[in-house]
UniProtKB/Swiss-Prot annotation:
Substrate binds at N111, K168, R288, H321, S368. It comes from Cereibacter sphaeroides. GO terms for biological process: reductive pentose-phosphate cycle. SUPFAM superfamilies: RuBisCo, C-terminal domain, RuBisCO, large subunit, small (N-terminal) domain. The basic functional RuBisCO is composed of a large chain homodimer in a 'head-to-tail' conformation. In contrast to form I RuBisCO, the form II RuBisCO are composed solely of large subunits. Mg(2+) binds at K191, D193, E194. The keyword Magnesium applies. Belongs to the RuBisCO large chain family. Type II subfamily. The lineage of its organism: Bacteria, Pseudomonadati, Pseudomonadota, Alphaproteobacteria, Rhodobacterales. This is Ribulose bisphosphate carboxylase. The record marks K329 as: Transition state stabilizer. Its cofactor is Mg(2+). It catalyses: 2 (2R)-3-phosphoglycerate + 2 H(+) = D-ribulose 1,5-bisphosphate + CO2 + H2O; D-ribulose 1,5-bisphosphate + O2 = 2-phosphoglycolate + (2R)-3-phosphoglycerate + 2 H(+). Binds 1 Mg(2+) ion per subunit. Pfam families: RuBisCO_large, RuBisCO_large_N.
Amino acid sequence: MDQSNRYARLDLQEADLIAGGRHVLCAYVMKPKAGYGYLETAAHFAAESSTGTNVEVSTTDDFTRGVDALVYEIDPEKEIMKIAYPVELFDRNIIDGRAMLCSFLTLTIGNNQGMGDVEYAKMHDFYVPPCYLRLFDGPSMNIADMWRVLGRDVRNGGMVVGTIIKPKLGLRPKPFADACHEFWLGADFIKNDEPQGNQTFAPLKETIRLVADAMKRAQDETGEAKLFSANITADDHYEMVARGEYILETFGENADHVAFLVDGYVTGPAAITTARRQFPRQFLHYHRAGHGAVTSPQSMRGYTAFVLSKMARLQGASGIHTGTMGYGKMEGEAADKIMAYMLTDEAAEGPFYRQTGWGSKATTPIISGGMNALRLPGFFDNLGHSNVIQTSGGGAFGHLDGGTAGAKSLRQSHEAWMAGVDLVTYAREHRELARAFESFPADADKFYPGWRDRLHRAA
């Protein structure tokens, strides 16, 4: 059934929809299956995403038609489809009237993903009007709160130097805590890897107790504050809360040095909201393990990593992993920096829309995946600043002189970039950084040709 007479309004102008302030706008890359027209399929998509079904129903009235989702722009050659969703369509909490991301997803990327006339459809961007934007929680904490704990400038404190304890599984409590202590002697921040929790060989309560002790010892030995991101991911709301409360109790006076990591993609919006609302004084660390199943450029359905990042800020993530923008081992490219800008700026350009009016704290980009001291300067050059959390697993513990030296090499790389000094030149007077060149020779050869002669040349 062709529903384009009802669910398509190509005379609508995007600027007018934005000025009107009552529509969420979504841009998709969509291809109909063979034999289906583009506008017909787009209209069916909008109908299935809002008030329609595959037939006319007798219960439809004028009010219902007034909240139809509408296709307002198509470009069949580029496979671009844009849809305007009235904000009235989206579900609200009965306890406080707040918005919920699960409703946003159910409409904009729900049943439409399985339609028989759609070859593929993927959301690449969305715009949220101010009246709906302010109904989301937004972040309660971000990198500025970490800088405060670390004793830095809370406006421009620079990179928080971190690691992921490796191997990601298989370490028992004491070796895990020992690795934490080793890294903390040289840098700032340690996170659980996403599967680390309460395995039988590493009970959470024992591990956390030893990690809290390792933090105290490292702080005493260095005179510096240290940070830990503890995984509280669980299927059950009460389990998440129980883990969080135990962790805070165990860290005691260092409770504000603790972030809570949640695997937000695999557990969904409910887990992120649980952490955001139950623990508003903790940094909420959104790990996105599994997201590549829908966000990868190889996947033609779902949504992009940019969309995921923007949704994370709406929900209140303090920080979210954004990949390495082509500078590490994970899928990505330099242009992915627009994700970071959407997370941090009050107004930012997306692939299709300019989002304004955040009115909330920024969300911190978390950089991880194949990074080491040699790759950082290029990454910072591309991004234009270094106000990120950066976690290197192999980049720290793959250092020839161990985790402490690896941690120091990451700090030294950041110091060199901040000072505008060439990395090889800086390494001549910083042994840990110099040894990073020897630890990662393939990267050294790629990014710093002739480094061996330059490094050992007299200053």
